[in-house]
Amino acid sequence: MFDLCKMPHVLVAGATGQGKSVGLNAIITSLLYKKHPAELKFVLVDPKKVEFSIYSVIEHHFLAKLPDGEDAIITDVTKVVQTLNSICIEMDTRYDLLKAAHVRNIKEYNEKFINRRLNPEKGHKFMPYIVVVIDEFGDLIMTAGKDCLLYTSPSPRDYAASR
C-alpha cells in the first residue's frame, strides 16, 4: 500500500506483457482496502473497455462520474476530455475551500472538517480523495490529442490539493 499524499502522480510504463495492468490493479485494490467509500473516489478511463470493467460492481460506492454520464467507467475517448475538464474545475473549487479553511492540503482540511472547525453552511464539505486512473495513456493522447496533455500535466498546485 502507498500513501496518496506522497505519490500524487504516478506513471506506469513498460512493454506489452510486462505487468502494467497487474500493477494498476494492485494499486487500485490496495486503495479499496485502505479507504472507506466516503474517503475515496476513482475516475477510471478504459479505452479498451476490458481492463477496468471488473470495477463496475463498485460503481455506486467508489466510482465518480459526471452527472450526465451513463457509465462510471469511461470507455469513450471523446468523453475523456470533458471528464478531465470537470476534474480540473473540481480541483479549483477545492483550492478555494483550502484557502478559506487556512490549510495547505486535503488531509488538514478533512481533519478540520471532522473536528467541526469548518462550517458546512459556508460551503465546506468533506473531500474524498479523487484518483484518476487512465489505462493506455499513450493511445489516449494519440486519439484525443493535446487536450489530454493539458489536463494531465502535473503542476505544483496539483500536489497541494492531493496532500
Predicted regions mapped to residue ranges:
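Conserved helicase/translocase P-loop NTPase motor core
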Residues: 87, 112-117
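Cytosolic-facing regulatory segments adjacent to core modules
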Residues: 106-109
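P-loop NTPase catalytic phosphate-binding loop
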Residues: 1-103, 122, 127-153, 157
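N-terminal low-complexity segments that are often proline-rich with Ser/Thr-Pro
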Residues: 160-163
